[in-house]
C-alpha cells in the first residue's frame, strides 16, 4: 500500500503546463473573493467552493445537501462536492493566461538561466520580455541575424527594406518561448563541449556556465520552454485565508491581492484581444500581465515592489518561504507543541538531582488526558466526559490520581537560549505548591540559569518510547559530563563551594587542637557538643577490615574533613592505598576549592558511573549549603584593608614616570617608547600593590575565602576593592596612561570615575552584539555539519593523522595526552626507550595510555581521525573515538555533527569581541576572539596578512634605506625574494631554515595559501590549531574532534580542473566521494580520469553546497537554491537531520536510525505487575 509518509527521497523539478492543469480542480475566472452580503465565496472566484471544496464539513454551497450521509455527492444546483472542509487546504486551481509570461526566477536569478541557455544577455532578454525591443526569430533570406534585437525604429526600417513576409521578429514572452522550443539540448551539449576544448579565459568560463545549465536540463528531463508559463497555479484558499475582523472588516493574505491583479489584467487582455484592439494597447496590457505575475512569484525582484496600504510591500510566494518568518524556519523546522507550559524558576535545594518541582495546577493541565483516563479506570468517573468535568472543577480525588500519574512520568525542562544539548534535560516531577517551577541548584550550570526571574518551559513526552528515552538518555543525573570536553558540567558553585572549603580548611591554634579521638563518630559528637572547633587539627584512630582482620591506625584530620569525607567514596584514587600506612587516610585530605571539586566528580564518574556520582553530588550539595550557612561568612567594608605600602609604591612610580618624561623631552627615547615604558611602569605598580594586599590578607578573611575557594569573585576584583584599579582603556581600546590610583574602598574621584565609564559601557555594548554574532555562528555550524552522524563501526581506512602538542610561542596550549585521550591509534605506537609496543594499531587509548605515551617522550603520534575517515555519509565509530559526554566509545547513530556545532558555538559568547591595537601601529592589528573564529571557519582572507614562504630553504635578510626584503634560498640555489611592507614585524632571522608554508612576518595566514602550498592536510592542521588557540586563550576547552568534524565538511568538495573522459565539467564543485566514484567508473572502461583539487569552502558556502536542497533552502538564499535545484531536477536523499524534520519524519539518528526502528518496548510485564499490586 502506498503511504504518504513512507518515501525515501524527494525530487523537485519544473512544472509543465500539462502538469499544472493536472493539479488543478478548475479555472479561476473572476477576481472576486467573497460576497459582502452573504459572506459566501463567489462562484469561479478566488475562494470558489466548486473548485476548492466546501467551506463547512459535509455541506454544499446552496445548502441542498447537508450531513455526512451525502458524502461524495456533487450537488446538481451549485456543483459543489459534499466532503470535508479540510480539502480547501490541498485542492488547487489555475488561471489560463491569455499570453505566455516568463518565470522571474529563471530570468532574473544570478546567473540568468534563461539568458545562459539562449546565449543572450539578461539585459537583452529584459528588453524583449518587457516589450521594449523585437527579437529576430527567423531571418530567412535577409541579412538580419537570429536572436538579433531590433528597436521599434529598426524594426520598421527592416519591414520597409525586406517586407513583412520575408523575416519573423516579435517581442514578449511568446518569442522567448519559441526560441526555447527550438533548442535541441543533445546537439547544443555536443557543440558546447567541442567549443570548450578550443577556448580559454573568459570565453571558457562562459561556455562552462552555459554547459552546466544545458546539462542540467538534459539530465533532468526538464524542457527549457517550461521556464515560460502559460498557466498559473492558484494555491489552495486555506493557505491564503480571508478572515473577518470584529467591526465587519476583512483581513486577507497578500497573495489574494496579487492573484487578483493577475486575474484582472488577464481578463482585460482577453477582452482586448477579442475586440481586436490596436497592437500598442495589447502590448502594454501584456507587459502589465508579465509584471503582475512577477510580483506574484517574487515581489520586488524587478523594479519597485507592489505595495499595499501604508506603503508596505506585499508578501509574494517567494517571501512566504524566505527568512526567519518564512515557511521553512517558522513552521517546518520549529513548531509550537501541545502539552507544554512555562513558568518562573526558583531554587529547590531539597530536591534530588533527577527531580524538579512542578506547580500543581500546571501539572494537572499538562497531564489532563492521563488523569482523565485514570479516573475512568478507577471507576471514579463513568465516562471521559464526567472525568473531564471532575478535572475542570478540581475535585479532591483528582490530586491523588495526579500524584500517581506523574510518579513515573518524566518531563523535559528547557531554558532558552538552548545553546547545547544540555539545555533540555529530563526530570522526575514532584508536585509543589505555588506557581513556580523548582530547579535543582546543580542543574543551573548546564542551563546557564539563575533565579533572578528566569523562565523555563516544561514539555511532556507522551509515547512510551519517548518516556523511556527521556528516562534513560536525558535524565539530569545521567548528564554529568559536558559533550564539548568531557569535563563535569555539574560542579557545585557558590555557597556549596564555600561550604566545602570551610569544612576542609585548617585553623592553627583552634579550640581542641591536638586532641586524640578513638573513632570518627566521637569527633563529630565532640564538635556538636562544642568541645572542638570544626577546623581544629586533631588525631583520630581509624579502624578498617582488611583481608578479614581489623586493622587500625592514627591519622591527622579535622572535624570538617571527616564530615566532608562522609559524602565521598573512599576509593577515588587520590590516595595510593597500596602504600603501607595509607590504608586509613581520608580520601579528601586537602583544601577543597572549586577546581578540586571538578576533579573529585570526574574521578567518581570514571570509577563509579553516573548514579553513584549523582548521589555523592547531592550529599556535597546538602553539606555545602549547611556549613556555608553555619560558617557565617559575610562581607563588610572592614574586611578590605588598604595596604600600608601603597603610598610609598605610588610615589616611587610617580618619580619613575617623571624620569621617563625627562628622557623623552631630551630626545633619548621616542614617543612610542615613552608610552610603552609608562604603561609598563604603572602595570608593575598595580601588581605590586595587589601583591602587598594579598600578602596582608588573613587566610580566614571572608572575601579572601570567597575568592580562594572559587565561590565568587577573583583576585583581580579584590585588587580593585582595596589595592588600586590601575590602567583603563579608552573607547578605541588604547590604554590611557593615567592610572586610576584609588581603590573602591577609598572611592574614586570624578576624573577617575569618568575614565572607568568607557570600559563599563563598551562591555555592555559588546555583550549585546556578541550574543547575536555567536548565535549566528552556531546556526551556520549546525547547518554545515548537521548530517554528520556515526553510521558505521569501522570505515576501514589505512590513513591516519599526525598529532603533536599545540604551542603558542613557548606556551603549550594543548598537550599531547589531551589530544590522544579517547582516540584510536592508526599504527603501532612504540616506546622509544625499550622498543616495546605501547599501543597496537587500531586500538583505543584511554587517559592512562595517553599519559604513558607522553611520558615515554614520543612527540608525534598517528591517530585515526575524522579528517581521514572514509565513511561516505557521516563518520565511523573508530575514526571518531570516544563520546565526550559518556566517556565511552561512541554509539552508532549518535549525531556528532550537531554536538560538534554546539560545542564550538556554545562558548562563543565567552570569547572577546575586541581587536587588540599594538600601540597605534597601523596594519598590525590582530583579530582575536569571536571575529577570528568566524574568519577561520568562513575561510576568509584575514586582516593583517602575514607573508608566507612558498618554498623551503635558508633565510637571507637585506635592508636598504628604502626597503626591507627577505629572501629564501632553496637547496638547489633558487632565490625567492619577499618585500616587507613598512610596519610589519619580521618573524625569522638571518640563516634560519624554514619550510614551505611558514610565516615570514607576524600576522595571520590566508588559509587558501596554505592549501596551495602545504596541501589539504596542512590547511586542516592550520585551521584546527588556530581555532584551538583562540578558545584556549580564553580558557575554554573544546575537544579536537568537534573541530575536525566541521573542518572535514569544509574540505569535502573537489574543484574539477580537467574533465578527462568523465561527465564532469571543469570549474564545477563535486563531492570527493562522487569524484572518486566517477573516476573509478571511467578508468574501469579504459578512459582517462578527471583531475581536480580539493577546494576549501567557508561554512556558509559549504552549507549551501550540501547534497540536500531542502537543508540548503532552509538555511539561506532560499530562492537561489530552489531555482538551481528545480532546473537540475535534484533528488534529496533525506540523509541529514534537517530534511527529515522538514518533511516530518523521524530523524535518522539515535533511535530514529533504521537499524533501531524495529525495537519494540515491552510494557506488558509492567501492566501485569501493576494489576497484581492493585
From Swiss-Prot:
Cofactor(s) needed for function: Mg(2+); Zn(2+)
The upper taxonomy is: Bacteria, Bacillati, Bacillota, Clostridia, Eubacteriales
Q: Which residues cross the membrane?
A: none
List the Gene3D superfamilies hit by this protein, alphabetically: 1.10.132.30, 1.10.150.390, 1.10.1790.20, 1.10.40.90, 2.40.40.20, 2.40.50.100, RNA polymerase II, clamp domain (4.10.860.120), RNA polymerase Rpb1, domain 3 (1.10.274.100)
Question: Which positions bind Zn(2+) 1?
Answer: 60, 62, 75, 78
Q: How does the record describe its quaternary structure? A: The RNAP catalytic core consists of 2 alpha, 1 beta, 1 beta' and 1 omega subunit. When a sigma factor is associated with the core the holoenzyme is formed, which can initiate transcription.
Which Gene Ontology BP terms does the record give? Answer: DNA-templated transcription
Q: Which residues bind Zn(2+) 2?
A: 795, 869, 876, 879
Explain the purpose of this protein: DNA-dependent RNA polymerase catalyzes the transcription of DNA into RNA using the four ribonucleoside triphosphates as substrates.
Q: What is its EC number?
A: 2.7.7.6
Q: Which InterPro entries match?
A: DNA-dir_RpoC_beta_prime, DNA-dir_RpoC_beta_prime_bact, RNA_pol_asu, RNA_pol_N, RNA_pol_Rpb1_1, RNA_pol_Rpb1_3, RNA_pol_Rpb1_3_sf, RNA_pol_Rpb1_4
Name this protein carries in UniProt: DNA-directed RNA polymerase subunit beta'
Q: How is the cofactor bound?
A: Binds 1 Mg(2+) ion per subunit. Binds 2 Zn(2+) ions per subunit.
Q: Name one Pfam family in it.
A: RNA_pol_Rpb1_5
User: Which stretch is the leader sequence?
Assistant: none
Please list the residues that bind Mg(2+): 450, 452, 454
Q: Which organism is it from?
A: Clostridium kluyveri (strain ATCC 8527 / DSM 555 / NBRC 12016 / NCIMB 10680 / K1)
> Family per UniProt?
Belongs to the RNA polymerase beta' chain family.
- Catalytic activity, as annotated: RNA(n) + a ribonucleoside 5'-triphosphate = RNA(n+1) + diphosphate
Amino acid at each position: 500500500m502506498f503511504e504518504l509518509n513512507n518515501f525515501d527521497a524527494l525530487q523537485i523539478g519544473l512544472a509543465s503546463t500539462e502538469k499544472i492543469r493536472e493539479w488543478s480542480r478548475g479555472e479561476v475566472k473572476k477576481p472576486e473573493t467573497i460576497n459582502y452580503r452573504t459572506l459566501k465565496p463567489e462562484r469561479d472566484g478566488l475562494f470558489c467552493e466548486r473548485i476548492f471544496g466546501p467551506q463547512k464539513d459535509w455541506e454544499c454551497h446552496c445548502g441542498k445537501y447537508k450531513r455526512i450521509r451525502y458524502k461524495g455527492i456533487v450537488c446538481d444546483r451549485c456543483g459543489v462536492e459534499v466532503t470535508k472542509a479540510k480539502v480547501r487546504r490541498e485542492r488547487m486551481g489555475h488561471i489560463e493566461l491569455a499570453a505566455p509570461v516568463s518565470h522571474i526566477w529563471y530570468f532574473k536569478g544570478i546567473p540568468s538561466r534563461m539568458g545562459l541557455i539562449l546565449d543572450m544577455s539578461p539585459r537583452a532578454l529584459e528588453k524583449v520580455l518587457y516589450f521594449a525591443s523585437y527579437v529576430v526569430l527567423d531571418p530567412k533570406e535577409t541579412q538580419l541575424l537570429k536572436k538579433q534585437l531590433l528597436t521599434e525604429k529598426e524594426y520598421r526600417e527592416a519591414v520597409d527594406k525586406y517586407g513583412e513576409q520575408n523575416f519573423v521578429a516579435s517581442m514578449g514572452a511568446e518569442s522567448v518561448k519559441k526560441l526555447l522550443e527550438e533548442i535541441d539540448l543533445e546537439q547544443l551539449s555536443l557543440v558546447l563541449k567541442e567549443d570548450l576544448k578550443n577556448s580559454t579565459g573568459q570565453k571558457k568560463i562562459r561556455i562552462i556556465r552555459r554547459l552546466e545549465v544545458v546539462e542540467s536540463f538534459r539530465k533532468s528531463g526538464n524542457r527549457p520552454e517550461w521556464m515560460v508559463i502559460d498557466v498559473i497555479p492558484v494555491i489552495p484558499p486555506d493557505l491564503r485565508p480571508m478572515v473577518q475582523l470584529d467591526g465587519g472588516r476583512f483581513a486577507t493574505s497578500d497573495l489574494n491581492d496579487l492573484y487578483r491583479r493577475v486575474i484582472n489584467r488577464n481578463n482585460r487582455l482577453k477582452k482586448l484581444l477579442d475586440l481586436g484592439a490596436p497592437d500598442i494597447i495589447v502590448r502594454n496590457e501584456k507587459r502589465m500581465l508579465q509584471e503582475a505575475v512577477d510580483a506574484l512569484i517574487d515581489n520586488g525582484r524587478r523594479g519597485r515592489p507592489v505595495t499595499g496600504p501604508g506603503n508596505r510591500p506585499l508578501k509574494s510566494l517567494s517571501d512566504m518561504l524566505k527568512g526567519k518568518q518564512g515557511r521553512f524556519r517558522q513552521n517546518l523546522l520549529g513548531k509550537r507543541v501541545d502539552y507544554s507550559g512555562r513558568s518562573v524558576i526558583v531554587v529547590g535545594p531539597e530536591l534530588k538531582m533527577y527531580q524538579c518541582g512542578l506547580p500543581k495546577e500546571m501539572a494537572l493541565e499538562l497531564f489532563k488526558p492521563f488523569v482523565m483516563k485514570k479516573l475512568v479506570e478507577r471507576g471514579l468517573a463513568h465516562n471521559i466526559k464526567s472525568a473531564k468535568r471532575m478535572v475542570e472543577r478540581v475535585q479532591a480525588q483528582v490530586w491523588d490520581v495526579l500524584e500517581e500519574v506523574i510518579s513515573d512520568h518524566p518531563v523535559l525542562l528547557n531554558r532558552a537560549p538552548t545553546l547545547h544539548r544540555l539545555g533540555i534535560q529530563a526530570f522526575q516531577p514532584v508536585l509543589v505548591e505555588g506557581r513556580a517551577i523548582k530547579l535543582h541548584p546543580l542543574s543551573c550550570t548546564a542551563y546557564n540559569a539563575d533565579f533572578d526571574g528566569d523562565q523555563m518551559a516544561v514539555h511532556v513526552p507522551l509515547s512510551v518510547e519517548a518516556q523511556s528515552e527521556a528516562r534513560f538518555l536525558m535524565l539530569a543525573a545521567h548528564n554529568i559530563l559536558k559533550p564539548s570536553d568531557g569535563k563535569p558540567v555539574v560542579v557545585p558553585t557558590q555557597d556549596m563551594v564555600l561550604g566545602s572549603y570551610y569544612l576542609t580548611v585548617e585553623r592553627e591554634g583552634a579550640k581542641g587542637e591536638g586532641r586524640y579521638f578513638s573513632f570518627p563518630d566521637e569527633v563529630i559528637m565532640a564538635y556538636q557538643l562544642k568541645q572542638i572547633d570544626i577546623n581544629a587539627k586533631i588525631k583520630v584512630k581509624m579502624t578498617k577490615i582488611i583481608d578479614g582482620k581489623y586493622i587500625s591506625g592514627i591519622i591527622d584530620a579535622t572535624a570538617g574533613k571527616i564530615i566532608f569525607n562522609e559524602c565521598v567514596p573512599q576509593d577515588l584514587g587520590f590516595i595510593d592505598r597500596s602504600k603501607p600506612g595509607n590504608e586509613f587516610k581520608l580520601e579528601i585530605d586537602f583544601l577543597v576549592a572549586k577546581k578540586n571539586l571538578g576533579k573529585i566528580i570526574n574521578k567518581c564518574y570514571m570509577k563509579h558511573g553516573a548514579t553513584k556520582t549523582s548521589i555523592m553530588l547531592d550529599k556535597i550539595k546538602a553539606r555545602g549549603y549547611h556549613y556555608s550557612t553555619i560558617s557565617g561568612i559575610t562581607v563588610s567594608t572592614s574586611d578590605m584593608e588598604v595596604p600600608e605600602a601603597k603610598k610609598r609604591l605610588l610615589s616611587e612610580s610617580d618619580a619613575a614616570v617623571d624620569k621617563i618624561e625627562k628622557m623623552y623631552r631630551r630626545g633619548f627615547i621616542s614617543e612610542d617608547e615613552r608610552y610603552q615604558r609608562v604603561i609598563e611602569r604603572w602595570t608593575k605598580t598595580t601588581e605590586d600593590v595587589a601583591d602587598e594586599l594579598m600578602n596582608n590578607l588573613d587566610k580566614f578573611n571572608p572575601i579572601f575565602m570567597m575568592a580562594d575557594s572559587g565561590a565568587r569573585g577573583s583576585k583581580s576584583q579584590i585588587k580593585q576593592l582595596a589595592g588600586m584599579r590601575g590602567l583603563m582603556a579608552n573607547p578605541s581600546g588604547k590604554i590611557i596612561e593615567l592610572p586610576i590610583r584609588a581603590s573602591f574602598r577609598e572611592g574614586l574621584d570624578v576624573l577617575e570615575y569618568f575614565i572607568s565609564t568607557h570600559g563599563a559601557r563598551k562591555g555592555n555594548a559588546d555583550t549585546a552584539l556578541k550574543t547575536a554574532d555567536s548565535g549566528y555562528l552556531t546556526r551556520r555550524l549546525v547547518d554545515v555539519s548537521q548530517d554528520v552522524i556515526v553510521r558505521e563501526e569501522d570505515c576501514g581506512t589505512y590513513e591516519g593523522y599526525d598529532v603533536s602538542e599545540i604551542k603558542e610561542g613557548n606556551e603549550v596550549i594543548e598537550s599531547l595526552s589531551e589530544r590522544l585521550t579517547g582516540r584510536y591509534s592508526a599504527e603501532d605506537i612504540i616506546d622509544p626507550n625499550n622498543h616495546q609496543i605501547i599501543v597496537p594499531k587500531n586500538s583505543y587509548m584511554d587517559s592512562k595510555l595517553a599519559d604513558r605515551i607522553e611520558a615515554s617522550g614520543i612527540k608525534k603520534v598517528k591517530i585515526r581521525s575524522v579528517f581521514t575517515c572514509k565513511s561516505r555519509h557521516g563518520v565511523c565509530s573508530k575514526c571518531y573515538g570516544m563520546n565526550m559526554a559518556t566517556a565511552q566509545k561512541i554509539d552508532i547513530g549518535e549525531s556528532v555533527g550537531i554536538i560538534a556545532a554546539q560545542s564550538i558555538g556554545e562558548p562563543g559568547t565567552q570569547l572577546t569581541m575586541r581587536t587588540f591595537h599594538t600601540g597605534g601601529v597601523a596594519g598590525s592589528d590582530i583579530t582575536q576572539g569571536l571575529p577570528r573564529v568566524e574568519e577561520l571557519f568562513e575561510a576568509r582572507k584575514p586582516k593583517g596578512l602575514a607573508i608566507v614562504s612558498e618554498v623551503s630553504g635558508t633565510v637571507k635578510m637585506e635592508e636598504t634605506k628604502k626597503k626591507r626584503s627577505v629572501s629564501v634560498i632553496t637547496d638547489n640555489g633558487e632565490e625567492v625574494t619577499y618585500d616587507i611592507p613598512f610596519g610589519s614585524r619580521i618573524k625569522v632571522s638571518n640563516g634560519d631554515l624554514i619550510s614551505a608554508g611558514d610565516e615570514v612576518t607576524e600576522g595571520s595566514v590566508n588559509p587558501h595559501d596554505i592549501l596551495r602550498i602545504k596541501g589539504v592536510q596542512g590547511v586542516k592542521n592550520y585551521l584546527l590549531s588556530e581555532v584551538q588557540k583562540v578558545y584556549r586563550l580564553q580558557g575554554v576547552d573544546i575537544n579536537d574532534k568537534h573541530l575536525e568534524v566541521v573542518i572535514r565538511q569544509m574540505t569535502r568538495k573537489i574543484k574539477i580542473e580537467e574533465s578527462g573522459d568523465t561527465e564532469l565539467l571543469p570549474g564545477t564543485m563535486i563531492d570527493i566521494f562522487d569524484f572518486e566514484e566517477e573516476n573509478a567508473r571511467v578508468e574501469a572502461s579504459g578512459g582517462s580520469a578527471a583531475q581536480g583539487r580539493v577546494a576549501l569552502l567557508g561554512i556558509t558556502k559549504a552549507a549551501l553546497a550540501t547534497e540536500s536542497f531542502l537543508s540548503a533552502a532552509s538555511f539561506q538564499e532560499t530562492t537561489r537554491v530552489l531555482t538551481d535545484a528545480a532546473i537540475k531536477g535534484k533528488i534529496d536523499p533525506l540523509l541529514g537531520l534537517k530534511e527529515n524534520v522538514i518533511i516530518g519524519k523521524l530523524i535518522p539518528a539515535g533511535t530514529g536510525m533504521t537499524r533501531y526502528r524495529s525495537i519494540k518496548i515491552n510494557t506488558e510485564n509492567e501492566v501485569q505487575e501493576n494489576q497484581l499490586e492493585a
